[in-house]
Amino acid sequence: MALPQISTADQAKLQLMQEMEIEMMSDLYNRMTNACHKKCIPPRYSESELGKGEMVCIDRCVAKYLDIHEKIGKKLTAMSMQDEELMKKMSS
């Protein structure tokens, strides 16, 4: 089965979307790392490795951050779909 051909314009859009996705994920990672580091690791530390409490804190922080990110993404998607439906109704 042959794959459908994509126009050059669609390829450019796809490339842009992929680049934006990478940039957004990189930004999420950086913000999450900074937030959890500030919350869980004291500014002055003497150990070269994380302590058990710090590891647990970071694990929970990352889990919460990703959970909230997912919930916000779902809510924004739902709102966007509602807006699209409203626009369709208004244009009919």
From Swiss-Prot:
Domain observations: The twin CX3C motif contains 4 conserved Cys residues that form 2 disulfide bonds in the mitochondrial intermembrane space. However, during the transit of Tim10 from cytoplasm into mitochondrion, the Cys residues probably coordinate zinc, thereby preventing folding and allowing its transfer across mitochondrial outer membrane.
Highest taxon of source: Eukaryota
Location relative to the cell: Mitochondrion inner membrane
Keywords assigned: Chaperone, Disulfide bond, Membrane, Metal-binding, Mitochondrion, Mitochondrion inner membrane, Protein transport, Translocation, Transport, Zinc
Species, as recorded: Drosophila melanogaster (Fruit fly)
Principal location listed in the UniProt entry: mitochondrion
Gene (UniProt): Tim10
An MF annotation (GO) of this entry: metal ion binding
Cellular component terms per the entry's GO annotation: mitochondrial inner membrane; mitochondrial intermembrane space protein transporter complex; TIM22 mitochondrial import inner membrane insertion complex
Name of the protein: Mitochondrial import inner membrane translocase subunit Tim10
PANTHER family: MITOCHONDRIAL IMPORT INNER MEMBRANE TRANSLOCASE SUBUNIT TIM10
